[in-house]
Amino acid sequence: MRDPVETYMNLVPMVVEQTNRGERAYDIFSRLLKERIIFVTGGVEDNMSMLVVAQLLFLEAENPKKEISMYINSPGGVVTSGLAIYDTMQFIRPPVATLCTGQAASMGSLLLAAGEKDMRHALPNARIMVHQPSGGFQGQATDIMLHAQEILSLKKRLNEIYVKHTGQTYQAIEDALERDKFLTADMARDFGIVDKVIDKRAEDPAAPKASS
């Protein structure tokens, strides 16, 4: 059976760039990283989180003032892995613009909301979902109680983060996250998770206009 990672990497396009030293080939994601674009794609877990954090820190070292763009298409995942990305977004100096393509569910929606104010966007057909954290544990009664307390503590902390970035009241956030709440891009804007729904990239004012 073929390694799925190897199969995936074989499908990643390569782009060739001309430099003063000749041609240089990049995989498409490395080339976009040069443009300060990061992708948060798929389930949020420790390995993915580590790569995103490393890219954020690298781009800060490259230029501590220039904007970083984060494209999100994620169903969510491990809370602590997502919080590692969240904390790094708040820690670094460059502003982080977020854009939802596809979906931003669970921790994905929190990362979408955590972008720089007025720089959080969603494409028209993006779907956003928020809910409270969930988990399961087996063991002794005392250990089960401790894990339940930890989940409740995480729930409170996540609610506070949503309050900070959406402008909603704590009670409104708690009510919204009680069950899976699915939002269209426009609903996510009204809720405060994104600032704007965009369907076209803004034109470059410096670009030459086509003549008739």
Curated annotation (Swiss-Prot):
InterPro entries according to UniProt: ClpP (IPR001907), ClpP/crotonase-like_dom_sf (IPR029045), ClpP/TepA (IPR023562), ClpP_His_AS (IPR033135)
BP GO terms, sorted: protein quality control for misfolded or incompletely synthesized proteins
GO molecular function, one term: ATP-dependent peptidase activity
Broadest EC class assigned to this enzyme: hydrolase
SUPFAM superfamilies xref list: ClpP/crotonase
Record's keyword annotation contains Ligase: no
Key words, A-Z: Cytoplasm, Hydrolase, Protease, Serine protease
A GO CC term assigned to this protein in UniProt: cytoplasm
Active site, renumbered: S106 (nucleophile), H131
Reactions that this protein is recorded to catalyse: Hydrolysis of proteins to small peptides in the presence of ATP and magnesium. alpha-casein is the usual test substrate. In the absence of ATP, only oligopeptides shorter than five residues are hydrolyzed (such as succinyl-Leu-Tyr-|-NHMec, and Leu-Tyr-Leu-|-Tyr-Trp, in which cleavage of the -Tyr-|-Leu- and -Tyr-|-Trp bonds also occurs)
Record-listed E.C. numbers: 3.4.21.92
Pfam families in the record: CLP_protease
Subcellular location: Cytoplasm
Subunit structure: Fourteen ClpP subunits assemble into 2 heptameric rings which stack back to back to give a disk-like structure with a central cavity, resembling the structure of eukaryotic proteasomes.
Similarity comment text for this entry: Belongs to the peptidase S14 family.
Function: Cleaves peptides in various proteins in a process that requires ATP hydrolysis. Has a chymotrypsin-like activity. Plays a major role in the degradation of misfolded proteins.
Protein's UniProt name: ATP-dependent Clp protease proteolytic subunit
